Curated annotation (Swiss-Prot):
Belongs to the Speedy/Ringo family. Residues 1-80 are annotated as: Disordered. This is Speedy protein E13. PANTHER family: WBSCR19-LIKE PROTEIN. One of its GO terms (molecular function) is protein kinase binding. It comes from Homo sapiens.
């Protein structure tokens, strides 16, 4: 009887935690592990015993912080208006780089210089002391027209020089009388025999004498040639001042560029 009471007393005494065998749950895992994973008691008031978890939310917070760090850089970036200015500057640099990539090839300068040796053209330039029909800008337009017409350089002849010069005067000059002299120099009329008569006078004199009829036919033929030359340039007769200066800059020491009306006394 005493032995039985002793065993009962021993069974009610608390055993140390180390000697307790973990009880199995219905799932087959220790109850202690399940409790430890699910319930964690606070070790001290106001202290969170759980370690910080780097979850997806933490990554997003970090990305937000990184983006917030980049925001000052975005504020320092140039505004769209400044970007447009930069693009405009790049455009100007491209122009400077291209130098408008002048379509006037060296062969057209060579054709122009070759025609300057023509005796009739020399006589016209020597006669035009006041530079009323052949100043430096009008002569530069001749080179531009040669380029736009697109003929091979060796095909340009005296008639093309006079057609281009006449068309340049049509574009830039308002006085018709000096321009008529270009036509008469083309047909090798001397200055003393140049009748500064209007087209109406030629029409009235058409049937009066053979010379008048010849002049009328020459004027009609010249105008026909001028129209074809104008069409060969695709009707682009206007030349900008910038392009004229670029043409002169190709050979700035050329003697024809000294024919400046501003230098006349």
């Amino acid at each position: 009887m005493g032995q039985i009471l002793g065993k009962i007393m021993m069974s009610h005494q608390p055993q140390p935690q180390e000697e307790r065998s973990p009880q199995r749950s219905t799932s087959g895992y220790p109850l202690q592990e399940v409790v430890d994973d699910e319930v964690l008691g606070p070790s001290a008031p106001g202290v969170d015993p759980s370690p910080p978890r780097r979850s997806l939310g933490w990554k997003r917070k970090r990305e937000c912080l990184d983006e917030s760090d980049d925001e000052p850089e975005k504020e320092l970036a140039p505004e769209p208006e400044e970007t447009w200015v930069a693009e405009t500057l790049c455009g100007l640099k491209m122009k400077a780089k291209r130098r408008r990539v002048s379509l006037v090839l060296p062969e057209y300068y060579e054709a122009f210089n070759r025609l300057l040796e023509d005796p009739v053209i020399k006589r016209l330039l020597a006669w035009d002391k006041d530079l009323r029909v052949s100043d430096k800008y009008l002569l530069a337009m001749v080179i531009a027209y040669f380029s736009r017409a697109g003929l091979p350089s060796w095909q340009y002849q005296r008639i093309h020089f006079f057609l281009a010069l006449y068309l340049a005067n049509d574009m830039e000059e308002d006085d018709e009388a000096p321009k008529q002299n270009i036509f008469y120099f083309l047909y090798e009329e001397t200055r003393s025999h140049i009748p500064l008569l209007s087209e109406l006078w030629f029409q009235l004199c058409r049937y009066m004498n053979p010379r008048a009829r010849k002049n009328c036919s020459q004027i009609a033929l010249f105008r026909k040639y001028r129209f074809h030359f104008f069409c060969s340039m695709r009707c682009r007769a206007w030349v900008s001042l910038e392009e004229l200066e670029e043409i002169q800059a190709y050979d700035p020491e050329h003697w024809v560029w000294a024919r400046d009306r501003a230098h006349l006394s």
